[in-house]
């Protein structure tokens, strides 16, 4: 409601999307009952100068944790009807099946929400098994994802210690947040970090046309080719692009290297290269064998 809804141009569609937002509450009771697409159609938002994305969230029940309430009807499992089976099934089973279908069939990227136990009445250890299962499934499928550590104290030493521990354990970014107090800029930062987990399939480099006219084997063209090949060998996902640019900036003949555009949907990044001052005239002088300024 802070970042996506304001970018829906049609007022009626915007109000309908607001009415369809999932409910939330404190305590142990499960609020989500089925996978829900919010909004119904993807909305384009800007994440800064270099990236525009189309966003649609799928809210899932997830995997139930010990102590959660809402999956039982008295002493018996709560039975529910789903689109995936003719007969009613236990709510717990339906929740897991729906979550798996979303992860496998409908999502392009995942946001795993876990907690240190400070935002519910349940201790941290109750969440660990479900957390590990979801992360393992995403890793097995190769889906890019990050983890949100929901906590009442995102800046405390104990939270930072747990955040760092989870990051090392799972090998993905872990962001400590207080979900109830998130601002638009916080959400934008989360989306940026999440999108940068997409695999990098293509790096596009832009530089002056005169460089392309140089003969094969020319020292500058060869040096540029070697530098770009070296960079390509070091990058696997969009998050690695800035590191690659840092390497290029140390190249003697380049004055500047910067990200021109990030295209998460294509798994591509566009990098602009500016050559050192005077290099054009230096090359021209070498070519005609006389000084040109």
Label every model-predicted segment:
Residues 133, 137-146, 151-217:
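Canonical P-loop GTPase G-domain recognition
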Residues 192-196, 203, 208-293:
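P-loop NTP-binding site
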Residues 126-132:
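Charged helix-capping and loop-helix junction motifs
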Residues 69-121, 136-138:
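Inter-motif core of Ras-like GTPase G domains
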Residues 1-84:
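Conserved G1/Walker A P-loop phosphate-binding module
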Residues 46-51, 102-106, 137-142, 167-168:
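Conserved catalytic network of the ASCE P-loop NTPase/AAA+ motor domain
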Residues 62-64, 116-119, 152-155, 180-183, ...:
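Conserved nucleotide-binding/hydrolysis micro-motifs of P-loop NTPases
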């Amino acid at each position: 409601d802070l970042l996506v809804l304001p970018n829906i141009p049609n007022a009626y569609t915007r109000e309908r999307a607001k009415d369809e937002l999932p409910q939330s509450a404190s305590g142990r009771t499960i609020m989500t009952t089925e996978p829900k697409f919010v909004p119904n159609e993807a909305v384009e938002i800007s994440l800064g100068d270099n990236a525009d994305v189309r966003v649609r969230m799928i809210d899932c029940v997830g995997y139930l944790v010990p102590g959660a309430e809402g999956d039982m009807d008295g002493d018996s499992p709560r039975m529910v009807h789903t689109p995936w089976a003719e007969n009613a099934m236990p709510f717990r089973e339906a929740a897991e099946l729906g979550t798996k279908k979303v992860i496998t069939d409908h999502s392009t990227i995942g946001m795993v929400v876990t907690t240190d136990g400070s935002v519910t009445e349940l201790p941290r250890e109750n969440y660990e098994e479900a957390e590990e299962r979801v992360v393992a499934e995403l890793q097995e499928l190769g889906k890019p994802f990050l983890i949100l550590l929901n906590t009442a104290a995102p800046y405390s030493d104990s939270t930072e210690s747990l955040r760092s521990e989870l990051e090392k354990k799972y090998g993905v970014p872990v962001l400590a947040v207080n979900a109830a107090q998130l601002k638009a800029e916080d959400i934008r930062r989360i989306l940026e970090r999440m999108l940068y987990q997409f695999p990098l399939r293509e790096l596009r480099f832009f530089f002056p046309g005169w460089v392309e006219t140089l003969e094969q084997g020319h020292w500058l063209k060869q040096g540029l080719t070697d530098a770009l090949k070296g960079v390509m060998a070091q990058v696997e996902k969009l998050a690695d692009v800035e590191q690659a640019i840092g390497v290029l900036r140390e190249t003697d003949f380049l004055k500047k290297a910067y990200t021109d555009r990030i295209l998460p949907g294509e798994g591509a990044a566009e990098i602009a290269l500016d050559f050192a001052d005077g290099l054009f005239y230096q090359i021209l002088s070498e070519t005609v064998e006389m000084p040109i300024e």
